[in-house]
A protein has these predicted regions:
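Glycine-rich phosphate/pyrophosphate-handling loop used in enzymes and phosphotransfer proteins
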Residues: 1-193
Length: 193
């Protein structure tokens, strides 16, 4: 996935992307979860560059695609955007939280406030390395919590993650947001596996 800082993607690359045209994935505690792309080929490679090699220019591209997808698919007003956080250890290793960067790009594109509403309170195994849905759910159960003092009462909150597979991480975080008062949680990812 060749991304140019000043132009984004060339038109030829845009045509070859694995566009995800379904209406959205059903995820527990979310109204829907939207993703503009399928997680394969050039998208998978681009996400790996973004997450593991510091290709932060991808955040702008992916964030723009996510914002357009949310605008086109959801169509209702949202009150704020938040993200699935990484642990402090992972933040220290990478130097950035990829989902926070994505959330900030989506917020900038849509003119919506971005808030840090969640924290990851324990390390988990990488979800991508776990194959069964039940094991994925067990891996993230209790790993997230709403930040102390956060009040989302009556709000429609967009929850940003990079990729949705089984929906276990998204559901766990969405449940925390609902406990913090969110009326609706709308999932938004770059890609769906």
């Amino acid at each position: 996935l060749e991304v140019w800082e000043d132009e984004g993607l060339c038109h030829q690359c845009q045509k070859t992307l694995p566009w995800q045209l379904e209406v959205g994935k059903q995820v527990n505690f979310c109204a829907r979860c939207f993703s503009p792309l399928w997680y394969r080929g050039s998208v998978r490679r681009g996400m790996e560059q973004f997450k593991f090699r510091g290709g932060q220019i991808h955040a702008r591209l992916f964030g723009t695609l996510m914002a357009q997808c949310l605008h086109d698919q959801w169509g209702e007003e949202v009150d704020c955007i938040t993200w699935v956080p990484v642990t402090r250890r992972r933040l220290g290793e990478r130097g950035f939280d990829q989902c926070e960067l994505l959330a900030r790009e989506v917020g900038k594109n849509l003119g919506v406030e971005v808030v840090s509403a969640l924290e990851k309170v324990r390390d988990t195994k990488q979800q991508a390395r776990i194959t069964s849905s039940s094991a994925r759910q067990a891996n993230v159960t209790g790993a997230y919590t709403a930040r102390e003092g956060i009040d989302l009462t009556g709000k429609q909150v967009v929850l940003v993650d990079d990729v949705v597979t089984s929906g276990a991480t998204m559901a766990e975080c969405a449940a925390c947001l609902r406990i913090a008062g969110a009326e609706k949680v709308i999932g938004q990812t770059v890609a769906r596996a």
